[in-house]
Amino acid sequence: MGYQLFEFENLEDCHKALIERFKEFFNAALKKHHQVSVAFSGGRSPISLLQKLSVLDLKWHECLISLVDERIIEASHEDSNAKLLHDYLLQNNALKASFTPLLPEKISGDTNELLDFANQHFKQPHLAILGMGTDGHTASLFPETSAFLNEEKENIVLTKPTNAPYERLSMSINALENCEKLFLSISGVEKRGVLEKALKENAPYSLPIARILHSKKVTTEVFYAKN
């Protein structure tokens, strides 16, 4: 358990390695489970990776795609993670995959209803691909929300970050640790510094990503690009 760190000089080489591991995991999980469930993170950073994954020659029709986290906004909004996946991943060969959103088509003002919907439709992913912010957040588990410190029984939790826009739904620490594998993709000197800080932390953790990297239940493969 814990983590494995793979370092690369540039993002292109980093993505190549991650994609190779993705293919290996995908095919092994398909053989084991007869279906593969993968959760993806949002944000702008993974766009080029999503595009590269979309053209892979895999049995996408046997794949269920879901979200690690989502902002509580309409699916048509530019900041929607569901829109991000539809625009950049669920294209080309990956168009054959099934997609399960975290939010219903019509969003009510009752966040408890939205949370219930997300948990009722949740399917445990075999793999989750994560990113990390310069504040050490991952998924939508932010340092100031303390949700990452809780052993939530729910698979999806509501978070209300004070340093980022929108209320959000996010996979809980429990759900992330129940994955068979986690991939973390980061780049740049600043995020390397955050990673180093997280690796040195001891419980109770101040950084959400540290909680993941020191997990005794799941291994995180960290793909780091210097540039």
Curated annotation (Swiss-Prot):
Pathway field: Carbohydrate degradation; pentose phosphate pathway; D-ribulose 5-phosphate from D-glucose 6-phosphate (oxidative stage): step 2/3
GO molecular function: 6-phosphogluconolactonase activity
Cited InterPro entries: 6-phosphogluconolactonase_DevB, Glc/Gal-6P_isomerase, NagB/RpiA_transferase-like, PGLS
S-S pairs: none
Keywords associated with the record: Hydrolase
EC assignment: 3.1.1.31
Domain of life of the native organism: Bacteria
GO terms (BP aspect): carbohydrate metabolic process; pentose-phosphate shunt
Reaction(s) catalysed (UniProt annotation): 6-phospho-D-glucono-1,5-lactone + H2O = 6-phospho-D-gluconate + H(+)
A Pfam match: Glucosamine_iso
Family label: Belongs to the glucosamine/galactosamine-6-phosphate isomerase family. 6-phosphogluconolactonase subfamily.
Function as written in the Swiss-Prot or TrEMBL entry: Hydrolysis of 6-phosphogluconolactone to 6-phosphogluconate.
PANTHER family attached to this UniProt entry: 6-PHOSPHOGLUCONOLACTONASE
Record's protein name: 6-phosphogluconolactonase
Organism: Helicobacter pylori (strain J99 / ATCC 700824) (Campylobacter pylori J99)
